[in-house]
Regions:
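Intrinsic low-complexity, intrinsically disordered terminal tails and linker regions enriched
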Residues: 1-302, 306-542
Length: 542
């Protein structure tokens, strides 16, 4: 069949384009006004029996008719069975070219919840210790089902239940002996137990880890993330306002997750040297273990334990330091100071702050959303200034072989690049790594004003929780700032303890090169004692 001409037609969705930019409060106000004006509506009923999420290819087209035109393309369709899993099908939909699945308000969370529910139902089982298996199996067979059902109902209703009769005690004894395992469910307590076992197995196999690294990519700042979020095909380093950036990021959580995955994989390959032809920044990597955690505003950051090939254990390092091996002490200090530090590169915090043309007006901690900035000092410099958190790192120019004696263009270009490197790293540290103690606050819940709806109130009478601060009721910082400062790196030859040079009390230790590459907050800690390793391991999987 040949088609000589084609006709275009418009498909009208449930809501028009003019409604997509309105807030939920404004939409409710519009709907109420429509009803008051005797406007018509479409009633959509539902069956008494809910739709099943198993073997039901039409459940997603029914829930999201605007995403599945004409009812085609549902998840779990017969022609894709045993070819593409439901999880992979959802991933492919989320990568659809026009990003309609990514930006839908409900599809990503509904699809993820279904995966979690199925994993919890089909991937769970009961686990018991082998030496108690015979005893527990007999106890299970002798349980009174009516008593067990009654306890379940009372617990479900929120009642605080205490075992009083022997039959009730037998039911509670089974709960103590059995461990409900859902290891396939991401984020479950059992998955955390698996993580703990994996970490300690790695420590048993590779020895003690040498470094603990935290990465916090700024999705609402980084141009790569904004490119993933936006619909444009051409990448550009366009600087946007904070409102525009935050609006884009909030509309597309999938793009933010893609950006985080890209940054982490780039870090592991290029900085750690994994599956690469060069050693890592900290040495030859023999292993790593990382976990992902969400922050208060639902963005992601990474905690990573790093093992270095040939690294000495904390006890071996301590023994060498106590033995007063001066050569080893000097080499160790030189290595530690070369890969992490706790102060600015070009001067004190005050001098760096004075040299930056733009300053952040208000922030709520190192992980908070950055606000608009105001110019200070030199107006001309402020006009040319670009916030480094919104730009990409500049590649280093080729290095001249005779750098110390040569004065060629390549050498001058290299010198200018290093000067820019130092100032950029300090600017990034000032914006991303300086801790500012704040108190928790509450504020009236403010609602966006709809110009077409005069009845909409600007401010709600309710009070919502404001940004959570780090100061407790005694005024003590929960993050343990300010920290102790030290003018130089010293070694206590009595107990082998190394005290690193640290000039900034409100800054964690970091790696300058890593800060420059990530253009965001990073923390790097040397694990030089067994106590610190145990504390970090517990922190990672809790």
């Amino acid at each position: 069949m040949s088609v000589s001409s084609c006709n275009t037609f418009t498909v009208h969705g449930i809501t028009g384009e003019e409604f997509t930019k309105l807030s939920m409060t404004a939409l409710k106000a519009r709907a109420l006004k429509h009803l008051e004006d005797q406007g018509k509506m479409l009633g959509i009923g539902h069956e008494d029996k809910p739709q099943s999420m198993y073997d039901n290819p039409q459940v997603y087209p029914q829930m999201f008719p605007w995403l599945f035109p004409y009812g085609y393309g549902g998840i779990g369709q017969a022609r894709l069975k045993r070819k593409v899993s439901e999880a992979e099908h959802k991933k492919s939909l989320l990568m659809y070219h026009d990003k309609c699945f990514q930006t839908d308000q409900y599809f990503p969370i509904v699809a993820f919840n279904h995966e979690q529910m199925k994993a919890g139902i089909t991937g769970s089982f009961l686990l018991a210790k082998r030496q108690k298996f015979s005893e527990i199996s007999q106890r299970l067979m002798s349980l009174d089902n009516s008593i067990l059902s009654g306890l379940i109902k009372r617990l479900t209703d929120g009642e605080h239940v205490r075992a009083e009769t022997e039959k009730e005690k037998a039911c509670f004894a089974v709960l103590d002996d059995l461990d409900h395992v859902g290891g396939h469910v991401k984020g479950s307590l059992t998955s955390k137990k698996y993580m703990r076992n994996e970490i300690w197995s790695l420590i048993s196999f590779l020895g003690a880890p040498s470094w603990f690294i935290t990465l916090s990519p700024a999705d609402n700042q980084h141009p790569i993330c904004l490119y993933f979020v936006d619909t444009g095909e051409t990448f550009s380093l366009e600087l946007r306002s904070s409102a525009a950036r935050n609006r884009l990021i909030a509309s597309n959580p999938v793009a933010a997750a893609r950006f985080f995955d890209f940054m982490v994989r780039s870090f592991i390959k290029n900085v750690l040297g994994v599956d690469h032809d060069h050693p890592g920044l900290y040495g030859k990597t023999s292993g790593y273990y990382s976990t992902v955690e969400q922050q208060g505003r639902l963005t992601l950051h990474l905690h990573l334990l790093l093992w270095i090939a040939g690294a000495l254990s904390p006890q071996e390092i301590r023994d060498r330091l106590i033995s007063r091996d001066s050569t080893f002490q000097q080499d160790l200090i030189r290595y530690l100071e070369s890969v992490h530090q706790g102060e600015f590169l070009t001067g004190s915090a005050d001098s760096v702050r004075a040299s930056v043309p733009m300053q952040t007006e208000a922030r709520g901690g190192i992980h908070a959303v950055l606000q608009e900035q105001k110019p200070v000092n030199d107006i001309e410099a402020a006009a040319e200034y670009k916030d480094p958190t919104q730009t990409l790192p500049r590649p280093a120019p080729p290095r001249c072989q005779n750098l110390k004696k040569c004065d060629c263009k390549s050498c001058k270009s290299n010198g200018n690049w290093w000067k820019d490197y130092y100032t950029t790293v300090d600017d990034l540290l000032l914006k991303s790594n300086m801790h500012r103690c704040t108190t928790s606050s509450t504020a009236p819940a403010t609602l966006p004003e709809d110009e077409s709806s005069p009845s909409t109130s600007k401010t709600s009478k309710s009070v919502k929780q404001g940004p959570k601060g780090c100061l407790d009721h005694n005024g003590i910082c929960r993050a343990r700032f300010p920290r102790e400062t030290h003018e130089t790196t010293t070694v206590d030859e009595n107990d082998g303890h190394v005290v690193m040079k640290k000039l900034e009390a409100n800054m964690n230790t970091f790696t300058p090169c890593l800060t420059y590459l990530m253009h965001s907050n990073t923390d790097v800690t040397s694990l030089s004692s067994g106590t610190s390793i145990k504390a970090i391991v517990s922190y990672i999987y809790i």
